[in-house]
Design a protein with these regions (language model features):
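Nucleotide/phosphate-binding loop and acidic/charged catalytic motifs
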Residues: 170
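DNA major-groove recognition helix of helix-turn-helix
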Residues: 174, 186, 224-226, 237
Length: 246
């Protein structure tokens, strides 16, 4: 039998749209620990600022899409804020469409055909979303884009000035759409950038990584890894198979 273990689902600047073809995903601790854990064969996971704990060890196969907050509104018809800190069964979001898609993917024999099937399904959802026509506030979109462009290092006071809103008004409108305050979003974007650098075949040292990604110092980087990943940076890298070429 395969040994049962766990791995951490760390914060990201994208929502997770996942469909299982073999096995299920068992959430032992939700991104928001106040929410009830569960087992899913298809789900969307919202943006979050704490690590989820996921059971590992059982064989699994599936398809995952990294979904932007804009994509959540287009495909699902709701703001990313509605999913913040949560993992929601796809059937409760898309109804029969979710179950039909899972069945079609399971009966399709090649990965190429599965990708094509999923792409077509997402295209239909996007077209329906465009007909609904509700667009996020352009100021919120601008603010997010600026945080991404700067790797999460832009000061929120400066961001508010660029947008032309008070910091408090920006925080409220941003949170209403995305689910995180701008400061938390910047933190997640910066953390994800550090994770990407750390997974490179020849990663930088932690002091260099901290400086390159806009952390105050190495201790600041270490604190973010403890709080966002539940692990040290070194332990987090060792847990990732592609970090060692596996």
């Amino acid at each position: 039998a395969t040994a049962r273990g766990t791995h951490q689902g760390v914060p990201s600047a994208h929502l997770t749209f996942l469909l299982c073809l073999d096995g299920t995903v068992e959430m032992l601790r939700m991104p928001d620990p106040a929410r009830t854990p569960g087992t899913f064969d298809a789900f969307v996971g919202g943006l979050h600022v704490e690590p989820a704990v996921i059971a590992s060890g059982a064989p699994q196969a599936g398809l995952q899409v990294d979904l932007t907050w804009r994509g959540a509104r287009t495909l699902l018809g709701l703001p990313a804020a509605a999913l913040q800190g949560d993992v929601v069964d796809l059937g409760s979001l898309l109804g029969r469409t979710a179950h039909e898609l899972l069945d079609q993917l399971a009966s399709t024999r090649t990965w190429r055909s599965r990708f094509a099937l999923l792409e077509a399904a997402l295209g239909r959802l996007a077209a329906a979303g465009e007909e609904r026509g509700r667009e996020p506030l352009p100021e919120v979109g601008y603010a997010w884009d600026r945080l991404e462009e700067t790797g999460g290092t832009l000061r929120i006071e400066e961001l508010a000035r660029e947008v032309g809103w008070s910091r408090r008004h920006l925080a409220g409108r941003f949170r209403d759409e995305i689910g995180l305050a701008p400061k938390s979003a910047a933190r997640v974007i910066r953390f994800e950038r550090a994770c990407t650098r750390l997974r490179a075949p020849q990663p930088p040292g932690l002091a260099e990584l901290a400086a390159d990604c806009g952390y105050v110092d190495q201790a600041h980087l270490a604190r973010d890894f403890r709080e966002l990943a539940g692990l040290t940076a070194t332990a987090w890298r060792a847990e990732r198979p592609d970090a060692t070429g596996g």
